[in-house]
């Protein structure tokens, strides 16, 4: 699902807010979450999950076009850990599939 599809689906399910208001709210939430992670903060949304940064150590990678080895620097990457309610809900939904 893309951000645009998320906004559309939310707009279809309620009639109190305009699609533009929903779009603004979604963009503001995502921007604030990105800023929090950029500041090194952890985000926890109970029942949904948590976002944090994990450090990826320096390593030797490979250029897929040439096959030559390339040294990659260490970096922080965003990490999402689903909450128990989210895991349970996903697993229940998948059990119903053929």
UniProtKB/Swiss-Prot annotation:
Q: Name one GO cellular component term.
A: chromosome
**Gene Ontology biological process terms from the UniProt entry:** DNA recombination; regulation of DNA-templated transcription; regulation of translation
Q: Which domain of life is it from?
A: Bacteria
CDD domains in the cross-refs: IHF_B (cd13836)
UniProt KW keywords: DNA recombination, DNA-binding, Transcription, Transcription regulation, Translation regulation
Q: Molecular function (GO) terms listed?
A: DNA binding; structural constituent of chromatin
What PROSITE patterns does its record include?
HISTONE_LIKE
Give a short account of what the protein does: This protein is one of the two subunits of integration host factor, a specific DNA-binding protein that functions in genetic recombination as well as in transcriptional and translational control.
Q: Which family does it belong to?
A: Belongs to the bacterial histone-like protein family.
Self-association state and partner proteins as the record states: Heterodimer of an alpha and a beta chain.
Q: Which PANTHER family match?
A: DNA-BINDING PROTEIN HU, INTEGRATION HOST FACTOR SUBUNIT BETA
Q: What is this protein called?
A: Integration host factor subunit beta
UniProt source species: Teredinibacter turnerae (strain ATCC 39867 / T7901)
Gene that this sequence comes from: ihfB
């Amino acid at each position: 699902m893309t951000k645009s599809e998320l906004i559309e689906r939310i707009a279809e399910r309620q009639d109190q807010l305009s699609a533009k208001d929903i779009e603004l709210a979604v963009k503001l939430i995502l921007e604030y979450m990105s800023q929090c992670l950029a500041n090194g903060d952890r985000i926890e949304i109970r029942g949904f999950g948590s976002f944090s940064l994990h450090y990826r150590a320096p390593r030797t990678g490979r250029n897929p076009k040439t096959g030559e080895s390339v040294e990659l620097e260490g970096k922080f990457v965003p990490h999402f850990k689903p909450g128990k309610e989210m895991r349970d809900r996903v697993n229940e939904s998948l059990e119903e599939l053929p």
